């Protein structure tokens, strides 16, 4: 009887997680559309925007895109989040942080070091996947 209860609890929690991820993907899609509109407004606006605003908008767009791709990959790979997608998101988020907040040189250097560590982790992760094949 215990096995059936464990299986039932796992199934219910899996359904709750799936529904939450579907809702999250809808919200992220709305934000992605909003960011697309903002990006188009930056391009065709007569106002002068700094290049930082435009680049920040592009990177935020890619963050939304990567999160949506992560959710899609979750459903396609039998309810599993691949590690490399989280690393991609981390690298993109740190690049955005460097672009937006680059006043303090030491912080920028630390962010760049964190990006280097993430790239090394991505390389190690990809090498492990290649060895499995």
UniProtKB/Swiss-Prot annotation:
The chain crosses the membrane at residues 13-33, 55-75, 81-101, 105-125. Keywords: Cell membrane, Membrane, Transmembrane, Transmembrane helix. GO terms for biological process: cellular response to phosphate starvation. The keyword Transmembrane helix applies. It holds the Pfam family PsiE. GO terms for cellular component: plasma membrane. This is Protein PsiE homolog. It comes from Bacillus cereus (strain ATCC 10987 / NRS 248). The gene is psiE.
């Amino acid at each position: 009887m215990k096995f059936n209860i464990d299986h039932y609890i796992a199934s219910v929690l899996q359904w709750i997680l799936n529904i939450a991820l579907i809702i999250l993907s809808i919200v992220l899609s709305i934000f992605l559309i909003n960011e697309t509109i903002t990006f188009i407004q930056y391009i065709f606006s007569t106002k002068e925007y700094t290049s930082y605003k435009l680049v920040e908008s592009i990177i935020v767009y890619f963050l939304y895109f990567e999160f949506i791709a992560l959710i899609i990959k979750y459903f396609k790979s039998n309810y599993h989040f691949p590690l490399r997608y989280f690393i991609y998101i981390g690298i993109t988020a740190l690049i955005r942080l460097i672009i937006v907040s680059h006043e303090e040189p030491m912080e920028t250097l630390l962010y760049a070091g964190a990006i280097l560590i993430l790239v090394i982790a991505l390389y190690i992760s990809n090498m492990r996947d290649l060895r499995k094949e």
